[in-house]
Amino acid sequence: MGLWSIRRWTKPRTKSRYPTPLTAHQLWMVSLGAPVSRDRTASRTTLYPFTRIDDGSARSWLAEQWEITSRDRLAGRLDELSRSGYRARAHQLHGFSPLAWDAALYVDIARCGFGCGMITESEAWTALKNIVPSVVRTYASWQEYADHYLLGRKVWQDGLRGTSDASAPAPQAAADAHLRALLDPANRSSPWNLAPWDTISHPDRAR
């Protein structure tokens, strides 16, 4: 194990800073971002994006992947993803609008914004709540959400061809396998099994 890995695994656990479990609705909202990160350090059941406290990684990820280095840039990116995102180009080219791809990225970015202190916990929850109505209107199951996420990912990946970033994304097979694991009813750790699709349509409750 390298020095960087040792340092990460000696950081405090996220649940030591945020011990209160998410409510059913909160877990459902966080779970919209579950397709994005396949890393074992990613937290699936907290608003904080990692299983261990690592604000620096959240800040670096936003800067390197999204050129987000301030609250204003974060707000601008979230607004763009909520209004049009990648689905606008997908609709123009292919006639379909994969909202799930934009929604998953939106949630991931909002969580990292909270993780590095660009926005408060309250602001992060408000951001997540803002994306819920359009997602609920568009999809009726996690399966539908997953299918559209993968469609959106493919459109995004196709758009990278011929650019310097063409080799950056993980293989499509890796994304497919990750989504299958999230959808597997036998996977007890999947947040999609912990918070079924219709959770958000019922009164919120403690877990």
Explain the meaning of each model-derived region.
Residues G2-R207:
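Polar/charged low-complexity regulatory segments
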